[in-house]
Design a protein with these regions (language model features):
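Anion-binding and metal-coordination hotspots
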Residues: 1-251
Length: 251
């Protein structure tokens, strides 16, 4: 039991750790010579730049970027010198957007969410299964799906994000038991015979629309397009000029 308790303490909320370096977490690496998705112990390096000058950096055991944004900004001593935060879609989440709105209201952020580019495609915009493409009646608060099945607002629900602890609020819509035709009543049910349901997150939708408005403005498009020329060369220099492709444990 003591062994498991010690391991749980080392995990510190992670799913894995290296026995030879407890701070390292097993991750998928970009360099996968065997092409088999092998996991290797490593770190997630975060760097903040301006005009290709590094103004802040940190190492994290989290494989995903979005969990590093908040602690990284908090440990950055010269953050008050800047009025913009620019990052790629790996950092775009409801938690991070909400955090930026609350903690850094004086800074404008240019961060797309994961589905930002995909939502702009013709395939997505014409996909009848997406809630965003359904007809919505704001007055009576109901949706009609691609077949004409009506979904009425049923109740509010909450879900707690295990990785961040954030409580997310949803509106649940349920297919009405009584539709216009028997065929629609059949389509309103799942294979198990229950009424179909869909969930809508008003806060997440608001934050996405706000991020989209900023990114699609002429100024936003220019600022975000410069991100890859500003920060990506830093990692290119580290890897290809200085040969830093792995860390070395000394002890």
């Amino acid at each position: 039991m003591k062994k498991y308790e010690e391991a749980e303490e080392i995990f510190a909320g992670r799913n894995s750790y290296s026995k030879t370096d407890h701070d390292a977490t097993f991750m998928h690496m970009k360099e996968d010579h065997m092409k088999n998705g092998q996991l290797k112990p490593g770190y997630n390096i975060q760097a903040a730049t301006t005009d290709q000058y590094v103004v802040g950096f940190a190492l994290y055991p989290n494989p995903t970027d979005f969990k590093t944004l908040e602690p990284f900004l908090k440990q950055m001593p010269i953050l008050d010198k800047f009025d913009k935060i620019v990052a790629d879609a790996g950092y775009g989440s409801e938690y991070n957007y909400s955090m930026l709105e609350k903690e850094y209201p004086d800074k404008k952020y240019y961060i797309p969410y994961t589905m930002y580019e995909k939502e702009k495609t013709r395939k997505y915009r014409n996909d009848p299964t997406k809630l965003a493409n359904w007809f919505y009646d704001e007055k009576d608060d109901y949706y009609l799906d691609q077949n004409g099945v009506r979904f009425n607002f049923k109740y509010y629900s909450q879900r707690k994000d295990r990785s961040t602890g954030q409580v997310r609020d949803f509106k649940v819509y349920e297919a009405d038991e009584f539709q216009l035709t028997p065929e629609l009543e059949r389509l309103a049910k799942t294979k198990s015979g229950r009424q179909r349901q869909v969930r809508y997150n008003p806060n997440w939708q608001y934050l996405k629309e706000k991020a989209k408005e900023v990114l699609q403005s002429p100024k936003g498009r220019h600022i975000y397009s410069m991100r890859k020329y500003d920060v990506e060369p830093i990692f290119g220099h580290l890897k290809n000029v200085f040969g830093m492709r792995r860390t070395h444990l000394r002890g």
